[in-house]
């Protein structure tokens, strides 16, 4: 059975790994399977799992959700951070869990670090002792990996500088947070629905499951807070950029206003209709330059008195 990654028996106080072929689903057993393997569908259907449930369990795309079935059976679809090598963490992996006839069946396409750690703990006889504890640890393991990734986002946010006008890091962090939020928000509702279903797995460990729900709620609130931080940084950068643009525009306008009268006078002299005034005088150019300087000075004093120059100094 190539689709069976691991098979554990939780019917005894210490979980034991099964190495024999699992033709039939047994209560208190955990079957961790490869979702894309061609034989898994026939195995599920041979064990009387409804075809609609099988289709949903093996679907290519799915969002986090909880689906109650008959006789205390249910399906829980979760998402986790992809922490595999060369993977983009925000491309979240999917863990599909089916509780059917007292057995827990989990399927995956991409290996999950959280599941791998649980399997390692079981191999070292340090893992969960029951299916209820196993499911809770899967949920909390996924929560923990999301928390670790959000720590890296927080470090990125702490490095933001409002004086740095480059928005590449801001946009990258914003995209990552939005990608995670897309799945984590419905995951919070899925875990809430699991708790409210009062399944025997949940009722045996109610406090642990509520703690897991509190954690995913806190994670969602953290994501919302970080998105607000990114938006605030972007607003501050835009504000600083607008202020700089306004200051430069004001300065150019002030300079143009100062030169406007002198430009008019020099242009008037350049018309040369009826001859240029002062051509016969050797001091004409000197007196004209002195007049321009006086005009510059008077304009500057006028602008200073009106407070126009103080505005550029303050900015």
Swiss-Prot record:
Keyword DNA-binding applies: no
Segments crossing the lipid bilayer: 251-271, 283-303
Topology term for the membrane: Multi-pass membrane protein
Coiled coil segments of this chain: none
Ranges per topology, Cytoplasmic: 1-250, 304-315
Catalytic activity: Zn(2+)(out) + H(+)(out) = Zn(2+)(in) + H(+)(in)
Localization of this protein: Cell inner membrane
GO cellular component terms attached to this protein's record: plasma membrane
Topological region Periplasmic: 272-282
Superkingdom of origin organism: Bacteria
Family note: Belongs to the CorA metal ion transporter (MIT) (TC 1.A.35) family.
Biological function: Zinc transporter. Acts as a Zn(2+):proton symporter, which likely mediates zinc ion uptake.
Protein name stated in the entry: Zinc transport protein ZntB
Organism: Vibrio parahaemolyticus serotype O3:K6 (strain RIMD 2210633)
């Amino acid at each position: 059975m190539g689709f069976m990654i691991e098979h554990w028996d939780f019917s005894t106080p210490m979980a034991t790994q099964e190495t024999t072929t699992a033709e039939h689903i047994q209560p208190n057993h955990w079957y961790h399977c490869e979702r894309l393997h061609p034989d898994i569908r026939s195995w599920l259907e041979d064990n009387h799992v409804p075809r609609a449930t099988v289709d949903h369990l093996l679907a290519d795309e799915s969002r986090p959700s909880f689906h109650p079935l008959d006789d205390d059976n249910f399906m829980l679809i979760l998402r986790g951070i992809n922490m595999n090598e060369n993977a983009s963490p925000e491309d979240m992996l999917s863990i599909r869990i089916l509780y059917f006839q007292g057995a827990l069946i989990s399927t995956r396409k991409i290996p999950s670090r959280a599941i791998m750690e649980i399997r390692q703990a079981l191999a070292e006889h340090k893992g969960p002792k029951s299916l209820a504890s196993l499911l809770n640890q899967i949920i909390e393991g996924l929560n923990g990996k999301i928390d670790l990734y959000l720590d890296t986002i927080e470090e990125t946010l702490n490095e933001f500088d409002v004086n740095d006008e480059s928005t590449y890091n801001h946009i990258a962090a914003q995209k990552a947070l939005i990608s995670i939020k897309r799945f984590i928000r419905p995951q919070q509702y899925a875990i809430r629905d699991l708790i409210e279903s009062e399944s025997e797995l949940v009722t045996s460990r109610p406090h642990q499951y509520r703690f897991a729900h509190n954690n995913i709620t806190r994670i969602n609130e953290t994501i919302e807070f970080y998105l607000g931080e990114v938006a605030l940084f972007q607003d501050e950068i835009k504000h600083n950029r607008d202020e700089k643009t306004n200051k430069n525009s004001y300065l150019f306008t002030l300079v143009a206003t100062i030169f406007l009268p002198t430009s008019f006078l020099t242009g008037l002299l350049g018309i040369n209709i009826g001859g240029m005034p002062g051509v016969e005088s050797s001091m004409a150019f000197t007196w004209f330059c002195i007049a321009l300087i006086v005009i510059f000075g008077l304009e500057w004093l006028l602008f200073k008195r009106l407070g126009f120059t103080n505005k550029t100094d303050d900015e």
